[in-house]
Amino acid sequence: MGQSASTTTAVQNHIHHSRSKSRSTGVISPMKENEDSEDVIDVFEVGEFDYSSNIPDECVASIFQSLSSGDRKRCSLVCRRWFRIEGQSRHRLSLNAQSDLASVIPSIFSRFDSVTKLALKCDRRSTSIGDDALVLISQGCRNLTRLKLRTCREITDAGIEAFAKNCTGLKKLSCGLCSFGAKGMNAVLDNCSSLEELSVKRLRGITDGAAAEPIGPGIAAASLRVICLKELYNGQCFGPLIIGSKNLRTLKLFRCSGDWDRLLEAIADQVSEVVEVHLERLQVSDIGLAALSKCSNLEILHLVKTPECTNFGLVAVAEHCKLLRKLHIDGWKTNRISDEGLISVAKHCPNLQELVLIGVNPTRASLEKLAANCLNLERLALCGSDTVGDPELSCIAAKCIALRKLCIKSCPVSDQGMEALASGCPNLVKVKVKKCRLVTSEAADRLRTTRGSLAVNLDANEPEIPDASTSDCVANEVGQENRQMASQVGGSANIALSNTGRSNSFKARLGLITGRNLMACTFRRWSSFGGSFSSRNN
């Protein structure tokens, strides 16, 4: 009784939501079929027939998949059979990776022996699990395909190397605020031949400067499709990996120090099939953009706070990347990208569907060209633009026939411009106006009355937001996509105090309240109307 009860309680204490705190647990052992338990009991009295016994295990597991995490836990306590099925049908685990997790790892993975997606997250103020615990996990999860490590600072190169040798089928690795370095990363690349997605943030073990050990390419280079590097002091050491990933489709570089022009030139010469590039707060100039223009299949480009990029670089991209569908530019109010670059985009990129301009000052000249040539333009966001007033909004209303979603923020438009939308943009379904102080609620009400099917969101009194980055918006979209994908994976479920969807929804609301960026609220609200700004949406 006591042993089994402590087993269930200890395991559930460690299985948690990413922001929950766990309690320390003692040594436990997994429940066995012949053990009595006060937590797991057979609810059917003697002489009663258990009609669920005729339902195959696979059907019971399928039913469990449609339940929330809490309901699954409660169902697992109905009887020993359901307890066993619920554990075996779990494919996703999120664990509090504090050091005391090591003692219960055998019990956890004895019950949950079908896990393919694992998240290990530790609080920054706590001591994380070390190499021995990671090796135990790799021995219990040989079929692991996805691993997320957060703030696991006690894991070294040796632990990652042992893990990579045991979990050779890994397809996705995401690590942040960890202490291992190039040796551990190379071990993953040398052993995981199926690796498709790699995301690295603040990897502390990478040596800065000329002595940095190069990373990659390894056998994983042949399968890699997505590489994302964030806040690395010496991200250029990943150059051999990026250049060697011939099948790379998506490259995201966020706030990585160093000059990236030369590396982008080498990448463009060797990796020509890239379709999506994100550059945020990066030291890159028109030289780097000119290099990217060699990627003729480029469809999605985000330039966020790259002040050395000018019209010259954007023109080069537009002239050679004619398949461009989504363009996000945060000009940081430097006025180095203006009508000249946008007119070139309008001239050479007829497939453009989504345009986001932050801190850029387009005029009617470029907007008319975009409306006339980009007939598939469905989503337009203009934020912090001093030149977008009523004439420009009237131009958009009259000429952007395909436009479905429009966001105007911190622009000098008034009620007159809103009235133009009443008779323009016949396909418009969503309008969002924020911090445009000349627009009144009466104008918004008139627009709602005139076009009953149009969703109008007016917020003129929101406090100023200091930052204007689109990266958080992208992260929220990717998170939404991951939740949709997870719901389609057989038997997948997060073991948490609350489900993942609830967690991400809370994070989204929190990000909106605190005003972390200028565009996050726009896309988050737009997505609720059935549209997605996801960079992966085709």
Residue spans for each PLM region:
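N-terminal adaptor-interaction module of cullin-RING ubiquitin ligase components
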Residues: 1-164, 169-226, 236-243, 250, ...
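CRL adaptor-proximal regions
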Residues: 1-54, 470-472, 477-538
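Innate immune receptor modules and recognition interfaces
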Residues: 45, 57, 61, 70, ...
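Short, solvent-exposed loop/turn at the beta-strand->alpha-helix junction
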Residues: 69, 99-105, 124-132, 153-158, ...
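Leucine-rich repeat
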Residues: 85-91, 110-117, 139-146, 165-172, ...
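LRR/LRR-like solenoid scaffold signature
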Residues: 120, 149, 175, 200, ...
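Ankyrin-repeat and related helical/solenoid repeat scaffolds used for protein-protein interactions
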Residues: 375, 379-452
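Leucine-rich repeat domain C-terminal region
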Residues: 407, 426-513
